[in-house]
């Protein structure tokens, strides 16, 4: 779906207005200018809706740009498939795009990349397939012991295979999407007070504090962030570890194989070492973004009455905004700032150049 079509659907406006707003923004016009002086081009939308429209337009353009970058990178690696192409086309957020790209992203040195460099990927494939029902996992690993490559024992070979599988599990886009939703519903934010810090008393209420991620208020998120920045609070995301591991196991474990236990160990390691820290960072970033956005909205609400207060104490005021094309706008407000009357006067003349008669 084209960006303009999506914006038309999301904001429930006429497609012509959508095209007009996009052009006005691209031409460098500010939101206040568009809201006030180009009303006929967007159906008299207020500045708040127009600002949301502009933000969404920017996000969708960044989303399309990132999709193309990811598509090009995966294609250059010769790993593009119809499944990946479809997933990219259906991705609605930057987070989903990054989840898709994660397995193909050039990584820094990790335990899995070290194991891959040692030639242990075929062993990881065998272990993860879990199709061998007889013998032992050690028997499968013996051919991969190679001192020249740094694989000095069967245990090292199996450990390397598990590292590869753990990273694969961590890179599973569908699994991460599922866990992210569950974390947002069930995870909690917990804090501990660092009592020997100078400003510790300021954050006394967060001494032994916890609250569900789904319920925490924006002002508490910002307060916790300040306390952490001042090193007065230790902050963690809490989630049932056993439950998280079970979800990971369910995505990859097949019972009845001599390698099943290794995949279970890899799933547990992948969750604890890779997935949970990543989810914790994502949850914290999400809460901070939501809290900051809410704080801005609250600031707007508090600022509005200050800006709209009567300009002259105990006086009735006539406001006059002259304009030729759109007419002269007049409004009368009473001593309390209530609008008593408003109108628009259109002055015309036989010739646009005849400014005197106008």
Pin down the residues of each PLM region:
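Generic start-of-chain signal for non-secretory N-termini
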Residues: 1-19, 26
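Short alpha-helical scaffolding segments that buttress acidic/His motifs in well-ordered protein cores
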Residues: 21-22, 101
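Short, small/acidic-rich helices and loops at N termini and domain boundaries
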Residues: 44, 52, 56-58
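Short alpha-helical segment immediately N-terminal to, or the first helix within
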Residues: 23-24, 90
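Feature marking long nucleic-acid-engaging regions of large polymerase/nuclease enzymes
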Residues: 30-44
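Duplex nucleic acid-engaging cores and interfaces of nucleic-acid transaction enzymes
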Residues: 49-51, 63, 68-69, 73, ...
């Amino acid at each position: 779906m084209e960006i303009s079509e999506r914006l038309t659907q999301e904001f429930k406006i006429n497609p012509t207005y959508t095209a007009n707003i996009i052009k006005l923004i691209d031409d460098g016009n500010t939101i206040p200018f568009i809201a006030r002086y180009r009303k006929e081009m967007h159906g008299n939308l207020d500045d708040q809706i127009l600002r949301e429209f502009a933000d969404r337009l920017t996000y969708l353009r960044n989303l399309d740009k990132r999709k193309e970058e990811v598509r090009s990178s995966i294609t250059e690696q010769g790993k593009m498939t119809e499944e990946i192409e479809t997933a990219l086309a259906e991705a609605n957020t930057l987070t989903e795009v990054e989840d898709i790209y994660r397995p193909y992203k050039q990584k820094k040195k990790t335990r899995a990349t070290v194991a891959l460099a040692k030639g242990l990927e075929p062993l990881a494939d065998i272990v993860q397939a879990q199709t061998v029902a007889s013998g032992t996992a050690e028997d499968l690993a013996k051919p991969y012991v190679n001192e020249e490559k740094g694989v000095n024992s069967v245990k090292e070979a199996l450990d390397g295979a598990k590292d590869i599988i753990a990273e694969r599990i961590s890179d599973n886009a569908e699994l991460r999407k599922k866990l992210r939703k569950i974390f947002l519903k069930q995870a909690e934010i917990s804090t501990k007070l660092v009592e020997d810090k100078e400003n510790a008393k300021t954050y006394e209420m967060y001494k032994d504090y916890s609250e569900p991620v789904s319920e925490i208020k924006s002002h508490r998120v910002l307060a916790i962030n300040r306390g952490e920045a001042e090193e007065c609070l230790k902050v963690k995301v809490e989630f049932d570890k056993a439950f998280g591991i079970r979800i990971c196991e369910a995505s990859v474990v097949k019972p009845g194989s001599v390698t099943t236990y290794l995949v279970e160990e890899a799933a547990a390691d992948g969750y604890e070492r890779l997935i949970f820290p990543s989810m914790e960072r994502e949850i914290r970033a999400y809460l901070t973004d939501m809290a900051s956005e809410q704080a801005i909205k609250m600031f707007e609400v508090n600022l509005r009455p200050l800006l709209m207060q009567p300009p002259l104490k105990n006086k009735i005021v006539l406001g006059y905004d002259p304009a030729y094309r759109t007419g002269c706008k007049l409004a009368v407000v009473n001593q309390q700032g209530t609008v008593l009357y408003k109108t628009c006067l259109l002055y015309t003349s036989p010739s646009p150049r005849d400014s005197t008669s106008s």
